[in-house]
């Protein structure tokens, strides 16, 4: 197994002595697509901020690979509507060369919009622009916060497929937050169900049947997700380590009521 890009060990983030993220373990290596799901207020964004180094952990240990380059795609692109801003200018503000910016736009399929106004882009085009800006950094790790936000249903599957292709081409690791549970199950290698703590973690089709997942999201959601099937020759425990099938799930000791 390759050395991890990022490893979180027993990470806790508390505000006013109340844990928002509680003893979370997470390991991401090159080639991994790890999707974090959970209800609103589950601590997903706080966990991502910790990975990015924006939020300091109250306890636990965060380890990153030497020289790690992270490309971050935020959930929203909020700009002053009266500020004239072209795609070209927006990309160059990242500090990358025009050649790197253009190459990144080509990878995400929006190079033809180089001279367009950012304000006139559709939701899907904005997400591809944000993804291109992250790619221009030539990242080892991509962190995507709700990448399908504002994208119509017809474009969501295409966007997730692009993310998979980028993983294969760049051999980078990917951490993704998503509420689009149906598409997540078809687009990821490993799912972490977060509700302050890790409720369950592992192979997507197993997660949909895990009692902790069912309790968090309900039987109807779990049953609808079970139609997705992936075929892997390994499984992971809650720490992200490869284990035998019999040891794949450690369960959840937290009270979900």
UniProtKB/Swiss-Prot annotation:
Entry membrane topology: Peripheral membrane protein
GO molecular function annotation: ABC-type zinc transporter activity; ATP binding; ATP hydrolysis activity
Catalyzed reactions: Zn(2+)(out) + ATP(in) + H2O(in) = Zn(2+)(in) + ADP(in) + phosphate(in) + H(+)(in)
First-tier enzyme category under EC: translocase
Segments passing through the bilayer: none
PROSITE patterns for this protein: ABC_TRANSPORTER_1 (PS00211), ABC_TRANSPORTER_2 (PS50893), ZNUC (PS51298)
EC numbers on record: 7.2.2.20
Keywords: ATP-binding, Cell inner membrane, Cell membrane, Ion transport, Membrane, Nucleotide-binding, Translocase, Transport, Zinc, Zinc transport
A GO biological-process term: response to zinc ion
Domain named ABC transporter: residues: 6-221
KW Cell inner membrane (keyword) present: yes
GO cellular component term of the entry, any: plasma membrane
Binding-site list for ATP: 38-45
Subcellular localization: Cell inner membrane
Keyword Membrane: yes
Gene3D superfamilies, alphabetized: P-loop containing nucleotide triphosphate hydrolases
Record's function text: Part of the ABC transporter complex ZnuABC involved in zinc import. Responsible for energy coupling to the transport system.
Family that this chain belongs to: Belongs to the ABC transporter superfamily. Zinc importer (TC 3.A.1.15.5) family.
NCBIfam families in alphabetical order: PRK09544.1
Binding partners and assembly: The complex is composed of two ATP-binding proteins (ZnuC), two transmembrane proteins (ZnuB) and a solute-binding protein (ZnuA).
Protein name per its UniProtKB record: Zinc import ATP-binding protein ZnuC
């Amino acid at each position: 197994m390759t050395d991890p890009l990022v490893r979180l060990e027993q990470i806790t983030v508390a505000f006013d002595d109340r844990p928002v993220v509680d003893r979370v373990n997470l390991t991401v290596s090159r080639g991994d697509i790890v999707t974090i799901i959970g209800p609103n207020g589950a601590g997903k964004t706080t966990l991502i901020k910790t990975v990015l180094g924006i939020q300091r952990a109250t306890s636990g240990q965060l380890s990153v690979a030497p020289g790690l380059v992270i490309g971050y795609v935020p959930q929203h692109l909020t700009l002053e509507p009266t500020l004239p801003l072209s795609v070209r200018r927006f990309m160059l503000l990242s500090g990358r060369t025009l050649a790197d910016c253009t190459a990144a736009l080509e990878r995400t399929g929006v190079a033809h919009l180089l001279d367009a106004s950012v304000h006139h882009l559709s939701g899907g085009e904005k997400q591809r622009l944000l993804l291109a800006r992250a790619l221009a950094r030539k990242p080892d790790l991509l962190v995507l916060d709700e990448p399908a936000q504002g994208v119509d249903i017809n474009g969501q599957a295409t966007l997730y497929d692009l993310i998979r292709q980028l993983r294969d081409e760049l051999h980078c690791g990917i951490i993704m937050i998503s509420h689009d549970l149906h598409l997540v199950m078809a687009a990821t290698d490993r799912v972490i169900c977060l509700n302050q703590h890790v409720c369950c973690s592992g192979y997507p089709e197993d997660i949909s049947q895990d009692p902790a997942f069912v309790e968090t999201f309900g039987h109807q959601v779990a049953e609808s997700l079970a139609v997705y099937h992936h075929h892997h020759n390994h499984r992971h425990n809650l720490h992200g380590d490869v284990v035998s099938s019999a040891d794949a799930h450690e369960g959840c000791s937290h009270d979900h009521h």
